[in-house]
Amino acid sequence: MKFNVANPTTGCQKKLEIDDDQKLRAFFDKRLSQEVSGDALGEEFKGYVFKIMGGCDKQGFPMKQGVLTPGRVRLLLHRGTPCFRGHGRRTGERRRKSVRGCIVSPDLSVLNLVIVKKGVSDLPGLTDTEKPRMRGPKRASKIRKLFNLGKEDDVRKYVNTYRRTFTNKKGKKVSKAPKIQRLVTPLTLQRKRARIADKKKRIAKANSDAADYQKLLASRLKEQRDRRSESLAKKRSRLSSAPAKPVAA
């Protein structure tokens, strides 16, 4: 069985291959997220404590948390659940997929472990070297949280701590740092004020245009009523002034 062992404190990862069933027996019948002592794997792992994070069987089916079986089952999964990507599916569509249970069995080919507690001796490639993170946080609030900054502190100075320098394809030395997102600067505040002022101006213009239209509409309706009443008055006067027709005997 292969072991993918990761050390979050150093950022290193290493693949180990162990074929001895006596050593592997300590991991059998254990569940996902359960901690296992590494003493059974050998003297070099003495004192280490590993946490089981996942695994795959020989056919590539992954382990799923919450499925209490050591074998393989077919579950009706929807998009967003673990072990199912769901790309290209309709909204809300579910598919029946094969997954392994969360209990470790001899059928597994790969088991993913994370070092929870360091042991007595160093493991080469895992605990003796430290691999710095390539990318730090981009969001301003996350940078403040990382460096324990207040609202008054300038975040832009602290991004240079994880600015990386490298040589590009042309042979030039280039430095690169992430662009800070959601950064509040005097320019962004000025733009926000301009947006709000523009919105207020547009609302005032719309209200004045609506009032002018109502005035125009009222005057046009009044003119229409006046014309109609005038035409009716003319009609009545014409009818009253016309001579009466003689009645036939």
UniProtKB/Swiss-Prot annotation:
Any GO BP annotation: translation
Matching SMART domains: Ribosomal_S6e
Post-translational modification: Ribosomal protein S6 is the major substrate of protein kinases in eukaryote ribosomes.
Keywords: Phosphoprotein, Ribonucleoprotein, Ribosomal protein
Pfam (any one): Ribosomal_S6e
Gene Ontology molecular function, alphabetical: mRNA binding; structural constituent of ribosome
Record-annotated membrane-spanning stretches: none
Any one annotated GO CC term: plasmodesma
Regions of compositional bias (Basic and acidic residues) in chain numbering: 220-233
Top-level taxon of origin: Eukaryota
This protein's record includes keyword Ribosomal protein: yes
Disulfide bridge map: none
Location of the region described as Disordered in the Swiss-Prot/TrEMBL record: 219-249
PROSITE patterns hit by this protein: RIBOSOMAL_S6E
Residues annotated with Phosphoserine modification: S237
Family the entry assigns: Belongs to the eukaryotic ribosomal protein eS6 family.
Function in brief: Component of the 40S small ribosomal subunit. Plays an important role in controlling cell growth and proliferation through the selective translation of particular classes of mRNA.
Protein name: Small ribosomal subunit protein eS6y
Protein species of origin: Arabidopsis thaliana (Mouse-ear cress)
Lineage, uppermost ranks: Eukaryota, Viridiplantae, Streptophyta, Embryophyta, Tracheophyta
